[in-house]
Regions:
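Predominantly a Rossmann-like dinucleotide-binding segment in NAD(P)-dependent oxidoreductases
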Residues: 132-199
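Conserved SAM-binding strand-loop segment of SAM-dependent methyltransferases
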Residues: 58-63
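Catalytic nucleophile loop
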Residues: 15, 85, 190
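Glycine-rich, N-terminal phosphate-binding loop of Rossmann-like dinucleotide-binding domains
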Residues: 79-80, 160
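Beta-strand-loop-alpha-helix segment that lines the small-molecule cofactor/substrate pocket
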Residues: 75, 81-133, 148
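N-terminal Rossmann-like dinucleotide-binding module
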Residues: 1-55
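Local beta-strand N-terminus motif with an aromatic residue
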Residues: 37, 57, 73-76, 150-153
Length: 199
């Protein structure tokens, strides 16, 4: 059995979700390759250390460049604010490391295309973190569509009922101009679902 050293950039909601998921692989899947939580990267050394202890990582850092350069880290998960995705992904791909990047890839179509091109040029595996399309309900819809049980889909409507901005004082990174707000955070899920269901 071999392991793969995981580095996660971002300790917030999705950083925690990925950390818990990787830590659970051995108890859920029978696989020869086991993820090992090597490094968590957060915006400050203090928060990185808190996440390291909470999620079970070996190391903590606030410098993503340091983490990408670490030979113990063999794959990178980008779960940081959207404005950081592009530079981190390009550096990780240049270092020869597979990347799982939360959506959206970049802040623009140009950034996203350059990230995809860099992965293709390097011949490195990369993936966007579209989790909703992997839910059992979504998989069942896809199965029904493939079997012709629903018929031809001619129209799609998506609705996301999230409460991120219910408190006008909250906002967080979604309220920052460079983050593309709720559209940048949630619309990719709807676009991905439409593509998966309708082709």
């Amino acid at each position: 059995m071999s392991d793969i050293g995981i580095g996660i950039i971002g300790g917030g909601y999705m950083g925690k979700a990925h950390s818990v998921a990787f830590a659970s692989v051995a108890s859920v899947f029978d696989t020869e390759l086991r993820p090992r939580l090597v490094t968590i990267c957060a915006s400050t050394p203090e928060s990185a250390e808190i996440y390291r202890k909470a999620y079970g990582f070996e190391k903590a850092t606030s410098n993503w460049c340091e983490m990408v350069a670490d030979s113990d880290v063999q794959a990178i998960v980008i779960a940081s604010p959207q404005a950081t995705h592009h530079d981190i992904a390009l550096a990780a791909l240049a270092a020869g490391k597979p990347v799982l990047c939360e959506k959206p890839l970049g802040l623009s179509l140009e950034q996203s295309r350059s990230m995809v091109a860099a992965a293709k040029t390097a011949g490195i595996t990369n993936m966007v973190g579209f989790n909703y399309i992997r839910t059992p309900a979504s998989q069942q819809v896809r199965k029904f569509l493939a079997e012709g049980r629903i018929g031809e889909v001619t129209w799609f409507r998506g609705e996301m009922t999230e409460d991120f901005f219910a408190d006008p004082e909250s906002g967080g990174w979604r309220a920052q101009g460079a983050a593309n707000g709720t559209m940048g955070d949630l619309a990719p899920h709807m676009i991905n679902a439409a593509h998966a269901f309708m082709g």
